[in-house]
Amino acid sequence: MHILKKPDFSDPKLRAKLAKGMGHNYYGEPAWPNDLLYIFPVVILGTFACLVGLAVLDPAMLGDKADPFATPLEILPEWYLYPVFQILRVVPNKLLGIALQTLVPLGLMLIPFIESVNKYQNPFRRPIAMAFFLFGTVITIYLGIGACLPIDKSLTLGLF
């Protein structure tokens, strides 16, 4: 039992369509040789030239030697954990800090149910979701910047 039906080349209608060139994609610029032979190598060589240029002009410097007896005053996590670190650092009760972090995914899961009557996929036509995500982005950036500052200036970002 065959899954695919093989074309019947003895059919005159099919032969007429194939003679006219129907069934083949002839519009636009062909991928061979234009893209594969000329454009791709230019992009690859350009990327390689940028990497070599950056390596020559701005080489990665080695930092200070590791000293296990000299620890910094405050150890910071990786940059993508700054907002979470700031929440745990500022909230007085650590259990409350963890509860605040669990509210983020729960709030994200709630958005489709809040705005279920909106049938549009365009984000600019979904004001509740856009407001929610913009507010979350601003708060995340605010917490990330605050995590880089000392604890006494972290909430006001040193502005007040």
Swiss-Prot record:
This protein's major location comes to membrane
Q: Name one GO biological process term.
A: photosynthetic electron transport chain
Spell out the coiled coil positions from the record: none
What GO molecular function terms would the record report? electron transporter, transferring electrons within cytochrome b6/f complex of photosystem II activity; electron transporter, transferring electrons within the cyclic electron transport pathway of photosynthesis activity; ubiquinol-cytochrome-c reductase activity
Q: Which PROSITE patterns match?
A: CYTB_CTER
CDD domains, alphabetically?
cytochrome_b_C
One matching Pfam family is Cytochrom_B_C
InterPro entries for the chain:
Cyt_b/b6_C, Cyt_b/b6_C_sf, Cyt_b6/f_cplx_suIV, Cytochrome_b_C_euk/bac
Per UniProt, subcellular location reads as: Cellular thylakoid membrane
Any single GO CC term annotated in Swiss-Prot or TrEMBL for this entry: plasma membrane-derived thylakoid membrane
Please give the superkingdom of this protein's source.
Bacteria
For the keyword Membrane, the answer is yes
Membrane topology recorded in Swiss-Prot or TrEMBL: Multi-pass membrane protein
Q: Where are the transmembrane segments?
A: 36-56, 95-115, 128-148
Cross-referenced SUPFAM superfamilies: a domain/subunit of cytochrome bc1 complex (Ubiquinol-cytochrome c reductase) (SSF81648)
Family under the similarity heading: Belongs to the cytochrome b family. PetD subfamily.
How it assembles, according to the record, is: The 4 large subunits of the cytochrome b6-f complex are cytochrome b6, subunit IV (17 kDa polypeptide, PetD), cytochrome f and the Rieske protein, while the 4 small subunits are PetG, PetL, PetM and PetN. The complex functions as a dimer.
* Family matches, as HAMAP family: Cytb6_f_subIV (MF_01344)
Summary of the function given for this chain in its UniProt record: Component of the cytochrome b6-f complex, which mediates electron transfer between photosystem II (PSII) and photosystem I (PSI), cyclic electron flow around PSI, and state transitions.
**Name of this chain's protein:** Cytochrome b6-f complex subunit 4
Source organism phylogeny = Bacteria, Bacillati, Cyanobacteriota, Cyanophyceae, Synechococcales
